[in-house]
């Protein structure tokens, strides 16, 4: 069946749904009914932009319609256009990956250059989800956890919460039930636990990240490479309910495995160890080993009761921090020894320098005193040679 043509009214309905949280909670039929009364009150000038956009959309659809030659093959120009779009998508993905790597390297190198690498703070995050849409990358979040980490202190703080999205994607109830029963075992909506206000939850997460990383900075979080798409989708799900968003609160999600690789190299550099044999394949393999699956007390109460510790978001968020501690343990000790030796050498150098300065000052004082005494002696000798004395009147 041929696709329906766009019209100005439906363009208005779609825009209203995108811009209003109330509209995003409505079905299409409910939104059409609600917008109908608004559309009736609009004059020709107000409707003009929407009618114009509809005409442009219809024209663009006609241009995109594939033309076939006599053999039923796609036109060469259209094939080249499709290949161009694929190349563009690949370039954007490559640029995004390079930007992630450069930013991660800059964070670690800046801390190293300021001699504060062991106090540099990183935030690790994890989500659990109820279900995923079949044809898109939309995930319905069920639980969120984050932890603040530094090499010196380890896990500094933890933020975790369950999420009640209110509803499951239509037709996905069975998938959500299967996912819950085989992983986290959390109750499904409408009986889900946790925060119901998605905008409030998103602001709470931003406040926690700002507290960890400081005001005026783009929030940067780290998660395992295979979870980056899911974490980004869950953040978008929470953000879309916030009508006050202006794009300034965007959270950047980076690869924690690349962070581990860079940390290993720079810590070895500070410790004076050879880092030529370190490669990302080795650090990735180590990261995927689970050393804490049977550690008690690191999951929430519900997951502990249901013996589902391994799938809880808090545990998923804490595991990277524990893994980094294990992997960098011996290297960190070497780095601390080097830093301690440097501090000892610096203290000894300062003490030696202080003694030299005191010695020079004492020598200068002695020379000044000797010079003064010599001057007085010479002055007295001059008076005696002339047969005069400063106290005798002739």
Swiss-Prot record:
One of its GO terms (biological process) is negative regulation of DNA-templated transcription. Residues 2-69 bind DNA. It is found in: Cytoplasm; Nucleus. Coiled coil: none annotated. One of its GO terms (molecular function) is transcription cis-regulatory region binding. Gene3D superfamilies: High mobility group box domain. InterPro entries: HMG_box_dom_sf, Maelstrom, Protein_maelstrom. Pfam families: Maelstrom. Residues 73-93 have a biased composition (Basic and acidic residues). Residues 44-93 are annotated as: Disordered. GO terms for cellular component: cytoplasm; nucleus; P granule; perinuclear region of cytoplasm. Keywords: Cytoplasm, Developmental protein, Differentiation, DNA-binding, Meiosis, Nucleus, Oogenesis, Repressor, RNA-mediated gene silencing, Transcription, Transcription regulation. Involved both in the piRNA and miRNA metabolic processes. As a component of the meiotic nuage, plays a central role during oogenesis by repressing transposable elements and preventing their mobilization, which is essential for the germline integrity. Repression of transposable elements is mediated via the piRNA metabolic process, which mediates the repression of transposable elements during meiosis by forming complexes composed of piRNAs and Piwi proteins and governs the repression of transposons. Belongs to the maelstrom family. PANTHER family: PROTEIN MAELSTROM HOMOLOG. This is Protein maelstrom. The lineage of its organism: Eukaryota, Metazoa, Ecdysozoa, Arthropoda, Hexapoda.
